[in-house]
Amino acid sequence: RNDIYNNSKIVTKKKKNVVDEKKVYEMYYDYSEDVKYMKPHRVLAVNRGEKEGVLSVSLEYNKEYIYNYLEKKLIKDENSECATYVKDAIVDSYKRLIGPSVEREIRSELTEKSEEGAIEVFAKNLENYLLTPPMKDKMILGLDPAYRTGCKLAVIDYTGQMLDIKVIYPHEPKNDFEGSKKIVLDLIDKYNIDVIAIGNGTASRESETFIANVIKDAKRSVSYIIVNEAGASVYSASKLAIEEFPNLHVEERSAISIARRLQDPLSELVKIDSKSIGVGQYQHDVKEKNLNEALDFVVSKSVNNVGVNINTASASILKYISGLTKKSIEKIIDFRNKHGRFNSRNELIDNKILSAKVYEQSIGFMRVLDGSNPLDKTSIHPESYDKTTKLLESIGMNYDSLGTEELVKKLDNIDIDDYSKKIDIDIYTLEDIINSLKKPNRDPRDDFDKPILKSDVLHIEDLKKGMELEGTVRNVVDFGAFIDIGIKNDGLVHISKITDRYIKHPSEVLSVGDIVTCYVDEVFLDKGKVALSLIKNDEK
């Protein structure tokens, strides 16, 4: 088996009389590659082509070598009358039974490894996408593009609440440019819109051109950004969306979702099946159970890493907080509906919303902003409040000083080892407390690159070889990365063009959401595609 694995080739052929209309599998019509060197994405592509009936797939290797090997093992006397029968039996049993079994095993192992790799890539991309920095303190206008049915507009405030809904018809067949322009400008003036979020679906580029022209006549500075709307339509038609906006059409809910994706990606994306978000590679070709487990873990990890505002968090995001059950989430929302808000973390246990055990597990991930206790807005666990108070008192500070320059300076000058003994706390917990006191409102997403805002349109015809551009990494796959440079289709940077040093996988250098400087390597106008390089002055 090992010998076959190390010395065989995967050979693919296009089946006769089969139509591959879009030529998806063109590179595999007459293709061969050593099994041991075959990349995961090619294994999964070949598997899909075979499953769809386009490709025939086989393993080719020296079977005569295998027969000879087995003959030497099994035939002790070449001159025996039985030798010929044994040789025939070896060939027959290998062709009918042993060979196909070994080949299936090898392909199964290849597939399993490739699926694990695809799931790992998807999980990493998803985590980086979920941790996209939120667009804080901005009034946002969401735009769900369309032709015949019109573009749906939704205004949301700083907290994500929907303020207004409109429909405009700037494109075919109505072409009501002036009427649509007036509606957009009126919304900008009325709500002091800062940013317009445009979905990247049908009519996206036409809508971008329309908005770029409109904002030139706005009375205030307005930018726009193209937002990945993958999965937005799924959410908009879901039970959850209907419960939240029962009187709105699907497309209107979609416009709200697009705006919220820009404002707080994590809170909005948790409402959608992770597989619909579109940052994976061959996710439909892997075992669903394994994929779901990996993605659920990533979502839970991301939510708990960021934390939630207990007074605004939806049930969709609360369900990922460690320790919370469906029943406890219902109690939290019921309390908010009856009393308006929580004023402290303690109210969760004082009102018997959470048991002592669940409270201990979950409370460190839940925040109360503008509450009665300033520590409730930090990631400090209530069980460490007494030690935190001692620390503050020992340096002459109090809760009112959280995040101030004076407190930061004093905390920078303390001896960690000495203070851990003085207030009887381990060094790691003390360091976490100090970091939280320095930045009580810290959001780990702020460490990531901010989305690129635009004010004008870029067309593929504008691109020239060697041109320097700024782009956002939208997807990372085994063979490279797709980068949004502001044209209709994302540009592709091949793994060989990412860096001038050797890397095994693009994820060693790039992550979804990264803002990168890239260079146009080649433009394919007929296909609407662009090849990019991250290597300056790349002459390869």
Where are the regions a protein language model picked out?
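Conserved, well-folded catalytic cores of nucleic-acid-processing
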Residues: E60, K72-K76, S93, Y129-P133, ...
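Single-stranded RNA-binding regions, centering on S1/OB-family and related RNA-binding modules
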Residues: G371-S372, D376-K540
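Phosphate- and other anionic-substrate recognition elements at nucleic-acid/protein interfaces
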Residues: A118-L130, K136-I140, R148-C151, V155-D296
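Long, highly charged, low-complexity intrinsically disordered interaction regions
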Residues: E243-R341, E360-K387, T429-S455, K464-E468, ...
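Extended, highly charged clamp/arch subdomains and adjacent linkers
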Residues: R1-M139, Y158, K181-L185
